[in-house]
């Protein structure tokens, strides 16, 4: 089993890196404001039709454009969900959503979280899925990538105020990156058996003689961007465990590759844009090493089985509860780590059925800020915050002014870094405390003891860090949970973007200092170790007490 796990992980990473490298070069051209070959004329027509002036923006103007863009998208999606019952492409005549569920869902998809307090096949019309949720999957992904474009330019430029044009970046990312990749992946899914139609649900009779409805819909098109944009919201309630979303072992592999493809490519693009490819590789190494460690722990925990059953003498050498037999325990464990490392939230197994330690690792990956590959864009700008924090810590130890890529990290930057890093832990810990203190919060707990607490902690962690996966034993389809998690998703997304853009605005105006003999190397093994240590230290200090009350207490109670 260990050899199989090693081969699965090694082959996955090899294929990922082979695909990500050329895509990184393409992304670097976009960051450098170079139109892709043959598309410059098309872009000029688009700017004219849309009334876009392709002039570069300062950080505040860029930020306001991003915020306005997402606010309008959220309002449009909220209205669509409320009016769903009177709109077309609704063959099952599904009613509009309640205001609190519509608000939760709109915030969820605008913030790239895709938390779902509903079952898609019994709640959403085809119009809501296509025009509402799928469109926001593209736009929320483009938002995250646009923000990291601006931050990367801030490191590459000097003595300037401009960071690019938000409308140009959003358009290019959507039309020339996300749409082509999604089309290719969707066509592959259709070939593998994923539905793509507008038919009404099909009645059929089971082998036992029972009558059921077979859900249909435009699944493949939504499935592709759900993964490539690290969105994660499933067309069906079972998400990628459903055979219509993820029918074969081959689609499962492609789904895992799609989740990490753009985050990995952005690391390569970062190195090219700042004219030092070693910097991008160092960040990628740090992410990969943490990822490998987490995969090993989850595979080990799940292949050991349930400790309580083992002590009773039952045959429980593998924990297959909540997993699809067509994927097996290793691929399910790998998928769980990928989806929580990458802020995706799609699942091909039920995380609530993992062992205590096996479920703790995905939770912890979210709690450290979704910086191990992370969401498209958000993962890299989140890791760059930790890079600057690590540089600052190293500067304190040797008594030198901290610098990264020739840019001095001053008091202003450190305040913004601290604010951005502390936003999500504050939301997670206070949100969990509020849920545990109130009757409305505890009413959603279907399990007592440490596991019930873990379900609450996981839900708030997932929302605040814009992941969207869940320990499904929590009844979150209530006004209390809809509003609490909507607040966490909204603040967890945009209260991080705001300081990141402020940092970009400060850095782009600074001069790039030439390297001196005393300059800290930020591309070697020593710095990679320092960066990993910084990420682990912040995660450990912040969440170990909460984890001790949940998954750790559950694990030791079973021994």
Curated annotation (Swiss-Prot):
Query: Where, by residue number, does the polypeptide cross the bilayer?
Result: 5-25, 63-83, 131-151, 173-193, 254-274, 282-302, 327-347, 356-376, 379-399, 416-436, 483-503, 525-545
Membrane topology for this entry? Multi-pass membrane protein
Alphabetically sorted, this entry's keywords are: Cell inner membrane, Cell membrane, Ion transport, Membrane, Potassium, Potassium transport, Transmembrane, Transmembrane helix, Transport
Taxonomically, the superkingdom here is Bacteria
Got a GO cellular component term for this one?
A: plasma membrane
Q: Tell me where it resides.
A: Cell inner membrane
Instruction: State if Metal-binding is listed as a keyword.
Output: no
InterPro entries on file: KdpA
Molecular function terms from GO: P-type potassium transmembrane transporter activity; potassium ion binding
Instruction: Describe its assembly.
Output: The system is composed of three essential subunits: KdpA, KdpB and KdpC.
Role noted for this protein: Part of the high-affinity ATP-driven potassium transport (or Kdp) system, which catalyzes the hydrolysis of ATP coupled with the electrogenic transport of potassium into the cytoplasm. This subunit binds the periplasmic potassium ions and delivers the ions to the membrane domain of KdpB through an intramembrane tunnel.
Q: Of which family is this protein a member?
A: Belongs to the KdpA family.
Q: What is this protein called?
A: Potassium-transporting ATPase potassium-binding subunit
- Originating gene: kdpA
């Amino acid at each position: 089993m260990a050899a199989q796990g090693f081969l699965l992980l090694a082959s996955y990473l090899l294929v990922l890196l082979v695909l990500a490298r050329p895509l990184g070069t393409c992304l670097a051209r976009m960051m450098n404001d170079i139109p892709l070959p043959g598309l410059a004329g098309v872009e000029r027509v688009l700017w004219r039709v849309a009334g876009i002036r392709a002039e570069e923006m300062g950080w505040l103007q860029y930020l306001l454009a991003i915020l306005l863009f997402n606010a309008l998208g959220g309002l449009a999606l909220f209205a669509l969900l409320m009016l769903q019952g009177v709109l077309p492409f609704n063959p099952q005549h599904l009613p509009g959503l309640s205001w609190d569920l519509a608000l939760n869902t709109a915030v969820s998809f605008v913030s790239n979280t895709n938390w779902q307090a509903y079952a898609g096949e019994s709640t959403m019309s085809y119009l809501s899925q296509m025009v509402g949720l799928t469109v926001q999957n593209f736009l929320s992904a483009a938002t995250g990538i646009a923000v990291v474009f601006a931050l990367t330019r801030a490191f590459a430029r000097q003595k300037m105020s401009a960071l690019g044009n938000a409308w140009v970046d959003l358009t290019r990312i959507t039309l020339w990156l996300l749409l082509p990749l999604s089309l290719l992946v969707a066509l592959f899914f259709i070939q593998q058996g994923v539905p793509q139609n507008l038919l009404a649900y099909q009645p059929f009779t089971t082998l036992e003689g029972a009558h059921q409805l077979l859900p249909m819909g435009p699944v493949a098109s939504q499935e592709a961007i759900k993964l490539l944009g690290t969105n994660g919201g499933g067309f069906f309630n079972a998400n990628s465990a459903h055979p219509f979303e993820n029918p074969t072992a081959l689609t499962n592999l492609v789904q895992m590759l799609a989740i990490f493809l753009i985050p990995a490519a952005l690391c390569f693009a970062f190195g090219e844009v700042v004219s030092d490819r070693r910097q991008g590789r160092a960040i990628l190494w740090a992410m990969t090493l943490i990822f490998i460690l987490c995969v090993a722990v989850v595979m080990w925990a799940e292949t050991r089985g349930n400790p309580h059953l083992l002590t009773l003498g039952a045959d429980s050498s593998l924990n297959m509860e909540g997993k699809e037999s067509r994927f097996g325990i290793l691929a399910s464990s790998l998928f769980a780590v990928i989806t929580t490392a990458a802020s995706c939230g799609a699942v091909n197994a039920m995380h609530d059925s993992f062992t205590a330690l096996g479920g703790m690792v995905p939770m912890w990956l979210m709690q450290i800020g979704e910086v191990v590959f992370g969401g498209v864009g958000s993962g890299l700008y989140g890791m760059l915050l930790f890079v600057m924090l690590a540089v600052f810590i190293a500067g304190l130890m040797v008594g030198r002014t901290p610098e990264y890529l020739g840019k001095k990290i001053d008091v202003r930057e450190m305040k913004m870094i601290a604010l951005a890093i502390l936003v999500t832990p504050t939301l997670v810990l206070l949100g969990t405390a509020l849920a545990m203190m109130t009757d409305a919060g505890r009413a959603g707990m279907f399990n007592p003891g440490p596991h019930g607490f873990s379900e609450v902690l996981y839900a708030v962690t997932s929302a605040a860090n814009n992941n969207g996966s869940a320990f499904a034993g929590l009844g979150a389809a209530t006004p209390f949970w809809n509003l609490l998690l909507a607040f966490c998703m909204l603040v967890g997304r945009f209260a991080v973007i705001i300081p990141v853009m402020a940092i970009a605005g400060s850095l782009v105006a600074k001069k790039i200092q030439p390297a001196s003999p005393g300059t800290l190397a930020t591309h070697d093994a020593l710095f990679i170790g320092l960066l990993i240590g910084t990420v682990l230290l912040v995660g450990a200090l912040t969440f170990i007490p909460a984890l001790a009350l949940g998954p750790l207490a559950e694990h030791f109670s079973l021994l």
